């Protein structure tokens, strides 16, 4: 029987960023091959650093998919754990080590007998940086294994162990990366009339763009426009010719995301034109679409967990965090939910350390749900 805690600790020590998860893939394949030995109803495929494990059903009417992400983050770990990251500047600070371990535990249970329906376990790379789900889908990695229904979870530090939270609508926002570069004319600080100050223009933009959310977005729907990077200038007495901004747009529907993206671009171009300056605007959403749960499937999942002993189900509001599972759910009906891990530190924090007792709870809950779906 799989040692869940040891498996998690092994994976926690080898975090790798998206599409570089070579050690992670090798570890997972070793475990998967041991679990599936002698199971002639199982097939395994790889796609770059990803893995697909397909359980052929005995009387299949559909394929049920379970997705887990496998990549880490470019963060220096500060947990002080004896099994902390062995990869300098890399950390499983988003709980993907937990996601993988739970998926392996569920796979082990699913292999106890051949399911009626097909089951697909997806170990997806590059959730954090390259929208690996979209890359796999667009590259045809699923082939005839593409699920009819897709499910997945994400750990959540501010929920207690034993709590599962989701809803029948949108769980995560869609996110769009924004890069803006204003190009003016540099000069001496004493002669501003001979220059065109990119720093001043970018500052105008930062204040003006706040009106997008306050005046273009329905306040009932909401959206976020945040610029976390502002780079301009090299010294105090030189007017800079360029200013660079790097930010994010977040919205709970794709229509709203597209509206905000359009308005941000328009404001940037308008401010630049007003100051007779050039501007470059790069908008990159890729596969980070809103995670929209299928209402009927979500209701079914919520009712199932609501009746499980040891599980407290929470009907939760959407979060403005992003997840590339939204892309797969735009292609396949499915559901995502939060799993409580009770950590005082948020996701992506260098000290984030979930409670390990959630591993057994997660495996028991998810595997029982997948068993039900596979038997329908």
From Swiss-Prot:
Pathway note: Amino-acid biosynthesis; L-lysine biosynthesis via DAP pathway; LL-2,6-diaminopimelate from (S)-tetrahydrodipicolinate (acetylase route): step 3/3
Q: Which residues cross the membrane?
A: none
Q: Where are the active-site residues found?
A: 69, 128 (proton acceptor)
One of the protein's GO biological processes? lysine biosynthetic process via diaminopimelate
> Single GO molecular-function term?
N-acetyldiaminopimelate deacetylase activity
Catalytic activity annotation: N-acetyl-(2S,6S)-2,6-diaminopimelate + H2O = (2S,6S)-2,6-diaminopimelate + acetate
Keyword Amino-acid biosynthesis present in the record's keywords: the answer is: yes
Alphabetical list of CDD domains matching this protein: M20_Acy1_YkuR-like
Q: What does this protein do?
A: Catalyzes the conversion of N-acetyl-diaminopimelate to diaminopimelate and acetate.
The protein in question is named N-acetyldiaminopimelate deacetylase
